[in-house]
Design a protein with these regions (language model features):
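Short, non-helical or kinked segments that cap or interrupt transmembrane helices
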Residues: 62, 84-98, 138-147, 199-205, ...
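Membrane-embedded alpha-helical modules
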Residues: 106-224, 331, 336-447
Length: 453
């Protein structure tokens, strides 16, 4: 429900459109950006590292700066739509991990300019799909969305655990990282228990602050890097000339379909967990259109696709802070981080273990939101079959990837599905939703007593 009050009050953080004092809004917006900042940059370093010929450190630094700028702009469009592009919901956008595998393959085989060309085409493909959502929206039934949201929550557990242990650094699992993650997690929990009023919703920011300070004392933060790179630096448009290869484009477009499923799930979870209502068709259409066309814009700045960030969906579900102006302050901080290297360097210096301590609870919240959505759909025979079978196949088959269970399938199928539980759950749940009879409930047979003569 949209807030209608014009009064500027902190209580409006729980309303979509209420006015919030800037000084009160900034901490909540900043909390969102801190939560996703490193995850927004990591895919670029992985994809750029796989590129042949290799990208220079200067080029990678430029792409990281561009990614911050693009993520902020894309978030603003989700919050305040342009025409039919944008959902008008508090969705935070960032560079997607979903594309890392396929884009790393494209970068290694065709070169980084081919990544840009494939993302340009794929983004237009998803954006157009979003604008035409009213023609295919009914295929995505509520039980499909609910099951996908549950799968998204599950798929993020390993991401949170990886961050908790220190990310992809050589000291993964070290005692220092485990202490950092634990202290951050406990701080979030204690703040959530003992803080009063609206301050209770700043538990993640409190955890990040305490964890960051502890990381400084443990020498896990290099403060000298914060002022490196100058004071102001404008994003670079078209740093690479796009190249187009049919094989790369087809592979990336397939992953855009998977990303669409995740976006539908994220948007549904945000509306259900943050606004306590069912999602509307225009919101799905606008969200997907923004995902797609913003990804094409991202490619123009040399970056991979952007999409909704599940971490922030979990944060909204946990705090119920849905105010668009509040989230906008975070988007502005992201844009500033792309224009002011010291700001971006500060955010980028957040240790993975600190982020992991904050994300574990939020990722669990996403999964619980999915279960709640399934419960709202009802536990009849049909819904139970769709949810149970799609989750069993999705989790089971992707967990067994190392056992070569996917080896009989073509390479493109392995790339899309072998390690992507959300993609498998989405496809299986769609198929089951289309082919299963509408009424599968077991009917009781009433026996008529016949008097024996």
């Amino acid at each position: 429900m949209r807030g209608s009050t014009k009064e500027c009050s902190i209580s409006n953080i729980y309303k979509l459109d209420g006015r919030v004092p800037v000084s009160k809004a900034i901490p909540f917006g900043l909390q969102h950006i801190l939560e996703m900042f490193v995850s927004n940059l990591a895919p670029i370093t992985i994809i750029a590292g796989a590129a042949q010929p290799a990208l220079s450190q200067e080029q990678i630094a430029m792409l990281l700066q561009n990614a911050m700028f693009v993520a902020g702009i894309a978030t603003l469009i989700q919050l305040y739509p342009v025409w039919r592009i944008g959902s008008r919901l508090p969705i935070v956008m960032g560079v997607s991990f979903t594309f890392v595998t396929v884009l790393s393959t494209v970068a290694a085989g065709y070169g980084y300019p081919s990544v840009i060309g494939a993302v340009l085409v794929g983004g237009v493909f998803e954006g157009t799909l979003g604008l035409l959502a009213k023609y295919w929206r009914k295929i995505i039934s509520p039980i499909v969305s609910a099951t996908v949201v549950t799968a998204i929550g599950y798929s993020l557990f390993t991401v949170g655990t990886r961050s908790f242990g220190g990310g992809y650094a050589d000291d993964f699992g070290s005692i220092q990282n485990l202490i950092l993650g634990t202290v951050t997690l406990v701080t979030c929990l204690l703040w959530n228990i003992f803080a009063k009023g609206y301050l209770k919703q700043l538990s993640v920011l409190a955890g990040l602050t305490v964890g960051y300070i502890l990381a400084i004392f443990l020498h896990k933060v290099d403060l000298s890097l914060i002022m490196s790179g100058g004071i102001i630096s404008l994003p670079t448009l078209l740093p690479f000339k796009p190249e187009f290869h049919l094989g790369a484009i087809i592979s990336v477009c397939i992953i855009f379909l998977v990303s669409s499923a995740e976006t539908i799930g994220d948007t549904s979870a945000m509306v259900s967990g943050g606004l306590d209502r069912e999602i509307e068709g225009r919101e799905i259409s606008g969200s997907l259109a923004c995902d797609g066309y913003a990804s094409s814009v991202s490619a123009l700045f040399g970056c991979p696709p952007v999409t909704s960030f599940s971490q922030n969906v979990g944060l909204i579900a946990m705090t119920k802070v849905v105010n668009r102006f509040t989230i906008m302050t975070g988007a502005v901080c992201m844009i500033l981080a792309g224009l002011l290297p010291p700001v971006g360097n500060f955010f980028a210096s957040l240790p993975d273990a600190v982020l992991g301590g904050c994300t574990l609870m939020m990722f669990g919240t996403i999964m619980v939101s999915g279960v709640q959505m399934i419960a709202k759909c009802g536990f009849n025979q049909r819904n139970t079959t769709i949810a149970a079978l799609s989750l069993a196949i999705g989790i089971g088959f992707t967990s067994a990837s190392e056992n070569a269970i996917w080896s009989v399938f073509p390479k493109v199928v392995q790339t899309v599905f072998a390690e992507n539980v959300v993609a498998v759950v989405f496809v299986v749940s769609i198929i089951l939703s289309l082919i299963l009879p509408k009424d599968m409930d077991i009917k009781k047979v009433e026996e008529k007593n016949v008097d024996a003569e």
